[in-house]
Each structure stands twice: as structure tokens, then as C-alpha cells.
Amino acid sequence: MSFKKVSFAAVAAVCLFLGGCTQPRTTQIELPKSALDSVNLPNEVAIDGEKFILKQKNARTAEFYLPNEKVGFKWSKLVSVTVDENADINEYQKTFVTALKSGQFGKAEYDFKSINDKEYQAYTIYYPIAGNPDFDNYEINLINVKSLNCGLRVTHYALKFLNIADRSKFHALIKQKMPIFLAQMPQVECK
């Protein structure tokens, strides 16, 4: 046997061994579908005269930050949109209230107002958590929750205040900002 025949046979054997078989195969990998894929999600939103840019997104939640702020916990204002394809609006509210009452998120004040059987608005005021640098400020969340054909959409407009802020003014601020938020929140609807 000549060197060329041996080399060809060796290369052919290695190719068959590494390839697994002589027939070409196609493998399709299906990536998990993102709940956000079912909605029209903007790249930026404007609320109360400020522009927020989409900077972070996972399968369920998109976070919009002010242009000069980084992803993470050190934001001053934040807009987020979460879509849960399987959530029931009533169960979602019950679970949220249970978590708030349990102190899971620290001390919090909250209120929920039903708009109809498919939508409600809410606010939360989270108190600073001593010793936790990520949660060492007051945080107010203005929230709209709405059942859509493609899932439950939860929109938050969050504002942080120093832990020395006069919280006696928070309820007046919520009353002032809630109509602005509801009128200007991103109109994320099913595709």
C-alpha cells in the first residue's frame, strides 16, 4: 500500500470517527421563547419630561434607565416592563400583597386600586434597609398591571429618594406623579 493510500484511509477514518456517520445531519436548537417577544417593546420611553433608554432585558423584564445611569441598583429613576404569559391578574396581586406584608422587601407601604377586572394601578413605598447598599434609600414605585391577550403586563415607574428624605411628602408626590405615569407609560401591547 502506498503512502498516499494509507494517508487517505487514515484521514477518511478520522473524519468518519469525528463526524459520527457519513450522512450529513442537521440539528436545530430551539431557544426558549421570551415573553417579551410577544409584545411591541420600544427602545426608549419618555415620562415626566425625561427620556429612558432600554439598557437591560431578560426573558420577562425590560429595564429602561436614564441615559447617564448604569444598569444595576444605583439608578435614580427607572422604568420597567414585565410580561408574564401565564399569570392571572388576581393571583399576581395576592402574591404581591403577601410578599409585601411578609417584609420580604423590607418595610413597605402600598395601595392597590382596581380599574376594572383586567387592570389595576398601585404604588409601593419601600423604606431604606440599613446596611444594604443596594436598598439604602426610599423607593417609590408607581405600578400599572393589565391583562393582555398575550399575558400579564406589569409596568413600573420607580423613583429613589435619600434615606433622609421627608417621607411625609411622598403621598402628595404619588398623587401628583401617578396621572403623569399612567398617561405617559410605554404602551406595550401584544404583537
Q: Model-flagged regions — what are they?
A:
Residues 1-10:
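Bacterial N-terminal signal peptides that target proteins for export
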Residues 13-14:
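Repetitive helical segments and hydrophobic/amphipathic motifs
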Residues 18-20:
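C-terminal motif of bacterial Sec signal peptides marking the signal peptidase cleavage site
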Residues 25-63:
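N-terminal "mature-domain start" segment
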Residues 48-87:
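Secretory pathway targeting signatures of secreted, lumenal, and periplasmic proteins
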Residues 75-115:
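Mid-chain, structured segments of secreted extracytoplasmic proteins
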Residues 104-146:
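Signature of long, low-cysteine stretches enriched in small and polar/charged residues
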Residues 151-191:
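Surface-exposed amphipathic alpha-helical segments
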